[in-house]
């Protein structure tokens, strides 16, 4: 089972490539869902309303199973696909790359466009800081208040992040744990009395 993936740490904006008078302005955004994707696309479109094309590609999901390449009016396969191929080449996911083109008066032809969009995506991703993220899941644990030391020790041993702690007589914790530690945590919790847990 896969426990981690590569993505970019933060957005990269306004990389510039000039090709026969045309300008290609590159952007890369970390995106985790459709909403973030939409926001990033709208942001770039609103910043460049007069651009000739806003071409983009994205990959989302652990194995990049959710993906799209959009030519935005350029000849089919000449823009979105070369951008998408750069995401594959860098082995990253949960990333959107946009290349905004301002037409400069000289036609580049399909092979020229492929080369330019590939290069625009490449220089944009070369500026990004590529990081490895570990997959996480949320766990909610209910336990007797006098067991809190045991629970906190267990979570800290596996590097969990506490999101919320409610210390009633029956205490509850919401925590983020790394999926690679899930089985060990489940085993330890199952061995404790008066403890219930569920995954969100």
Residue ranges and their predicted role:
Residues 27, 54-56, 94-97, 138:
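Structural motif
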Residues 130-145, 175:
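Short glycine-/aliphatic-rich beta-strand segments at the starts of folded cytosolic domains
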Residues 169-170:
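N-terminal positively charged helical leader segments and presequences
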Residues 175, 181-184:
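Terminal, non-globular segments
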Residues 192-197:
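Charged, surface-exposed alpha-helical interface/stalk elements
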């Amino acid at each position: 089972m896969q426990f981690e993936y590569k993505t970019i740490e933060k957005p990269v904006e306004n990389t510039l490539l000039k090709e026969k008078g045309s300008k290609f302005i590159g952007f890369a955004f970390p995106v985790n869902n459709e909403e973030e994707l939409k926001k990033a696309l709208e942001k770039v479109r609103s910043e460049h309303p007069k651009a000739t094309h806003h071409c983009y590609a994205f990959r989302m999901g652990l194995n990049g199973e959710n993906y799209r390449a959009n030519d935005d009016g350029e000849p089919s396969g000449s823009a979105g696909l070369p951008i998408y191929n750069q995401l594959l080449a860098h082995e990253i996911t949960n990333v959107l790359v946009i290349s905004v083109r301002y037409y400069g008066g000289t036609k580049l032809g399909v092979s020229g466009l492929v080369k330019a969009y590939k290069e625009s995506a490449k220089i944009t991703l070369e500026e990004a800081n590529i990081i490895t993220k570990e997959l996480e899941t949320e766990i909610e644990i209910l336990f007797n208040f006098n067991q809190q030391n045991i629970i906190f020790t267990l979570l800290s041993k596996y590097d969990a992040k506490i999101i919320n702690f409610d210390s009633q007589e029956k205490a509850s914790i919401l925590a983020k744990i790394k999926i690679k530690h899930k089985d060990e945590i489940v085993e330890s919790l199952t061995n404790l009395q008066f403890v219930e847990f569920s995954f969100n």
